[in-house]
Amino acid sequence: MDRIVIGRKAFRDKVFACWLGKNIGGTLGAPHEGKRFALALDFYDPVPTKAAANDDLDLQLVWLKLLEDEGADPPLPRLAEYWSRYACSYPWNEYGFFMRNWSRGLRPPVAGCFENYFVDEMGSPIRSEIWACLHAGDPQAASRMAWKDSALDHAGGEGMWGEMFWAAVEAAAFVESDPMVLIHVGLAMIPLASHVARSIREAVWCRENGLPLGDARERIAGRFGHLQPCNAVPNHGFTILGWLYGKDFGDRLCKAVNCGYDTDCTGATLGSLLGILGGPAGIPAKWREPIGTAIVLHPFTRGFKPPATIEELTERTVALSEKAATGKHEIAFGAKTRLPEDVLTRLFRNDLAVTARGQDVHMGVEVCGGREVALHYGGEPVLRPGIGRTVWVMIDGREAHVELAVPAGWTAERLGPARFRLFSAEPVADRNQVTVTAPGVGAVPFTVLGPGEAKGFPAGDNVAKCPKCQARVEACICEGGCSCRAK
């Protein structure tokens, strides 16, 4: 079978332009984030002297380190561990609630959805580029990694489908340039009835039926708009509008950002995609010169040495991508890009994405002895007194005979080799440990919450922040100490 061969020089150029476009689009949109009305930008306003610090890029630098340390296919718990080390101070929306659940002992993917109002937001769709570059020309593999990433803080929500969509689109864009083909590649990876997919299709319908851009924008806002400006559903429609209605790099970015809402994210995502499609030559100097190529890190991203420039980020990304390709039979790097006749059929393959999105998000996953151990809660990770709760265990995706130790006063009635009914007639403590033991694996602890730790959280509210540094109270970055944790 002929391979998809990607030319090394062209690939390096596209990766560079991807990251540069990310910085440009994010910097364009950053001053206007949260404005839920149409704008009229035709350039940066204000004109910057450097790139804006942006979690859209920063969090992918954490994944860069992870991939360099752990290899191209880290298990889900490793992603969670790296976030907890290097990005735990972020308090915003879904980020804060993932870390709130993590600190209570829960593990993803259930830690990414339990009591998390923000699973439908943009925090994970903006992290797609690292997976697209890692799996250039292999959309389903990029989408599979995007599922893992988004399971941290958007498990089962629209943000998950958004990241899977963009990872696939961007991965395919290294070898295909037709917007409609790319959009349908992305849609092939996500559920048909997801609201993100509906918003994207509505944007396409508007363009194909000749609606003026202003009318198209109002149509998306009217049918998919949300109280939260960072909700993924309208923002995906707006990004597609900018792409399809714009004439060139700058015009497309401005048209997307001018739709309002989560403007730094729509701008950054579209900027990345346009960078992949057009390479450095497609980015006019007037857009590049104000920000240069230095990477400006947000203070909440800390504890490791990130790339200092887009050039360094490009070289490190390319090295990872070439290493990942060595294990593939259908993707290779060479002197020039060469595509097989059935390239479109290959781009639309979605087996890995379908398998990924079919996974249970009501489970916690740990790694022990190189094995993935999952405790399936069958819903919320909570035991209430007097109510039996069936849980089950999977090891590397399969049921195996395990033992389950539970707290004093609980019972664990065995229903099968790996299935148990938990019960407590007495009041249940706020945080409880159950321990899975299996031959060749060892003992793996998981947390089950009691009703006192599962009282909910007001929809739309954020976790507590330090009044000085604005970080999560539990991960305050104030120098010299701070009293915020005692309040």
What are these regions (language model features)?
Residues 473, 486:
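Cys/His-rich microdomains that often coordinate metals
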